[in-house]
Amino acid sequence: MKDVYIVDAVRTPIGRYNGALAGLRPDDLAAHAIRELLARTPDLDPARIEDVYFGNANGAGEDNRNVGRMAALLAGLPTSVPGVTVNRLCASGLEAVIQAARAIALGDASIAVAGGVESMTRAPYVLPKSDRAFPAGHTELYSTTLGWRMVNPRMDPQWTVPLGESAELIADKHRIGRDQQDEFALASHRKAAQAQAAGAFDGEIAPVPLPQRKGDPVVLGADECVRADASLAAMAKLKPSFRPSGGTVTAGNASPLNDGAAALLLVDEEGLAATGREPLARVSASGVSAIDPQYFGLAPVEAVHRALAKAGKGFGDLDVLELNEAFAAQVLGCVAEWPEFDPAVLNPQGGAIALGHPLGASGARLAGTVAHQLARRGSGVGVATLCIGVGQGLALVLER
């Protein structure tokens, strides 16, 4: 097996729903990330890229069936460079990184681009087709922004429980109160705001120019959802989103809806020489898991255990663990099931509650964020992990 390195990782700023990135198609967001990634490695001939792996969760609209290939072409890569789109829901971007790393480790490729993209703002509405030419009655219209659609009636209802209700079930299981969740969310915003102020994201963000009707483009250079002014008092005023009576999950302690893209350059030793650069990190191991879907948010517990075991590491070896913050209850539930884990290394720059969670992009964003943190440290071990709808977890171990 070959060693696999992450040479660089870039991402767009994460836009809020109907925010600054609302006017940009997802394939254009993805192309921007790829274009900026390669611009930072000018010694690399783009024709040497052997595949582009891109994660995308919704895929019902302008993602255009195979956004990996479309984005590669829009980014100006040679037509000889293939592209593929992968879907593991919220972990699609991390799945793309893992698939690219696996291909390189096996010798099937030397240089690959991996990433993910989602525009939750531009996700379309869809109509199911009738099995009759002229159906009578009403037809249901589905939003593809988030949640289940056209679920098979044979599925056990607990397998497609709304994700927010699943977070409530996790809170019930681990007795995680509203105050704990709000305090965690506040900490996420504070850490993210501090990281922004310190320039911690500058090395990974590729600012996006936004065309205006008149005058020069406006440039978006920072994540839109971070609230430096967040407070427990403001969060306490929010009503429960999923259980009107006695619920603890709110818009304040859950991740928002977002738009964004991320891309990473992965290589073997030969490919590394072609870039003329020092890598950010080395890919060490990955792990995937599945559990009862109604507790989907706890699936990273086993995924991280499996990934660390493959890497020959333990929780005590970790310098950073980036766990996607779909819900505060879900993160706190995972931490409760890792008694040997030190929460001090958890999401040191804030997480998705503050930064945002553009589904298919988030896993690639997390991998890039871990890689950049390890590079700034000069050495260390990091993990990127996410929970996934329908009860799955995915984790990646990086080392430097």
Question: Predicted regions: what is each one?
Answer:
Residues F54, E165-E168, Q212, S284-A354:
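Active-site pocket-lining segment
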Residues L24, N56-A112, T144-G147, Q158-P162, ...:
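Conserved catalytic cysteine-centered active-site region
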Residues M1-A71, A75, S166-R178, S188, ...:
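Conserved active-site "lid/cap" helical segment
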Residues M1-L24, L146, L232-L298, E302, ...:
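Condensing-enzyme catalytic core mediating Claisen C-C bond formation in acyl metabolism
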Residues N87-E118, A171-A200, A263-E270, P358-S379, ...:
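Active-site-proximal alpha-helical scaffold in enzymes
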Residues I111-L169:
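Flexible glycine-/small-residue-enriched beta->alpha junction loops
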Residues G23, D27-H32, D43, R149, ...:
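N-terminal extracellular/periplasmic Venus flytrap/periplasmic-binding protein-like
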